[in-house]
Each structure stands twice: as structure tokens, then as C-alpha cells.
Amino acid sequence: METALAEVQLSCLLCEQTFDATEKLDEHLPTHFPQPVSTGQTCDICGRTMRSSLELHQHYKRYHEAHVPNTEGHFQCQLCDKVFLLQDHLKVHVKIEHATDGYQPDEKSLDWQHYSPRSLDTTNDYKLDPILCPPPKRKYPPRSPFFNPNLWLGADNCFM
């Protein structure tokens, strides 16, 4: 019986080339099915892969903004050395972290040229700032069967 298995010729279904061992056929098949070339962009910091360079840039801004090295056009906090790509994010950082420290940002910002620590009032700013106080979540109707499984119709009720 073993001699019959040894004489079996395996053929490739795509090019009809014959092989005497399954290992050789397995080595041959990748010639017809090459591995896809990775077109994704990989984050240097965390290793996550994005589909485009735009998604990678948005990923950097969202998750690694404080870890980006300081270059021209970036805004650096003078107290904790965090770096932000957008000036608005630096402002929010200042409001949250250093509002009572008497902090003055660097000269890149025109809004802060007339800044004095005594004039910074953060008591009512949180009501106007959408970053510090996001809008409330939407409320869905409590009687909606989509969100309440107790209101789902059983399959046995449909055939009566």
C-alpha cells in the first residue's frame, strides 16, 4: 500500500506542473499567490498600522501629540515640556493643568501677548468651551425595541 502512495504524482491545479511530494507543491503555490504588498502606514511610536498617511497623521495628533519632538510650528508648554501641534490644544492644556501656576505661553501666540495671570478666569470658561465640556449624549426613547430586548417580538407570536 505504501508503494502506491509513493508513486502518486501531485499536480498544480493552475499550471499542471507535477510534484512527487506535498512539500514541493506547497513551495510552488506561492508563485501563483504572492503575498500582498503592504500599503499601510505604520506608527513609529506604537506600531499601529493605518491605511493612509492622512490616517497616520490624525493618529499622531490624537494619541501621540505630547510625545512629538519640538519642531518649528509646534507649541511647547513651558512648565512641563509637552509639545502640541495645535495652539488650541496648548490653551486647553494650560486651562486644565497650569491655570493657577502663573503660566505664560511662548511668543508664538498673539492671543497671549496681553496675558496676565490675574485676568485668567476659568470659573465660567468650561460652560463655553466644547473641549472641556462636550455636549450631552443623546437620549433614546425608552420604549424603543431596538434598545430594550424585553420589547422584542418572539418568533412564536408572528405565526398566530
Curated annotation (Swiss-Prot):
Entry keyword Transcription regulation: yes
GO molecular function: DNA binding; zinc ion binding
The keyword tRNA processing is assigned to this record: no
Superkingdom to which the source organism belongs: Eukaryota
Lineage summary: Eukaryota, Metazoa, Ecdysozoa, Arthropoda, Hexapoda
Organism: Drosophila melanogaster
UniProt keyword list: DNA-binding, Metal-binding, Nucleus, Phosphoprotein, Repeat, Transcription, Transcription regulation, Zinc, Zinc-finger
Zn finger region (C2H2-type): 10-32, 41-64, 75-98
GO CC annotations, alphabetized: nucleus
Its job: May be involved in transcriptional regulation.
Main location: nucleus
Residue(s) carrying Phosphotyrosine: 115
Name the UniProt record assigns to this protein: Uncharacterized zinc finger protein CG12744
Pfam families documented for this protein: zf-C2H2
Residues found modified as Phosphoserine: 116
InterPro entries: ZnF_C2H2-type_TF, Znf_C2H2_sf, Znf_C2H2_type
Location(s) in or outside the cell: Nucleus
